[in-house]
């Protein structure tokens, strides 16, 4: 069945005029490095995304080994590198090395392939920089959580205490650097259970109890919970299927504009956009000025980091987003033939209504027969992945299928059946059997 599913997906990729890939590598429960690859292609006038393959890698996951596995699959399955127009990875050196990284090696044989640094990883990197004061509070908050969660006895005792105090929650969340959304959820839960945590740490004579009795510390903790909650919302909006460069840029641009607005309001002493912090300031009677400088420094740092990692959207492709209204400078990247076709397309009011009614990728595929040149040019921009979200979902499935009880499992076929949207053609498989199995 797995072979049949693979054949369906590979055949669609072979027939697609263009395609793009996203890939990532991770280590499974048996300490074996696994390379995960997803593909985006065109089939029946629609863009499809599907699992391409997952293979184990040698002990050293170098760029050469990753490229070897990737290229070997392309050659064995008859896929054409010349049709690959996008590759999305994280920013690891093995992927992005200037001279011998994976991306460089792929672009040597697929010069049309555009590299996209996973936008979710970029967002996570941009959010890491913080003033020293906030870093200290974050580290201490993680120690508080780990003091309770690292020992089963402490966890049970804390749960009993929360139950006796009628708390909404009875457990803290364990912080993990690996998971994107971990930090914000941990801090939010800690703020919600701060009274219970203070009482518990006091009862076990932990030196960390002093932090939860410090009003300034609590205020900065509340701010961190609020700002990471907002960053988590951005992170979540960047996840999902069928995203393209324009939707991703819109989400990031919206967040950057919010940062500008928050900076201005904090400068005026207003903290209303940070409800947890505002609640702490109200309960403790602390003036906003007590945390104003730290928050301003952090927000300014976030603005600078987002500007560095994302930059400004190039205007040359605005005609793809809206061929009926775009800056005149966007015409500079078009040939005469493409500009004439775009002029004709933009004069068709029926097509204007069609753009409103369907996703942008379907719109450009729907006009392929009438305007093949601009349609192809638009799809080359829209086909690349903007994140490795699907690979991360695949690794979650990998941990579910290949666990400590099945650590020697050869997981490739199981993953394909679990992750692929293609269904095994059962009737075709049964008909192809020369000798059916008889019942015993």
Regions from the PLM with identified roles:
Residues 1-440:
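Alpha-helical structural modules in large enzymes and assemblies
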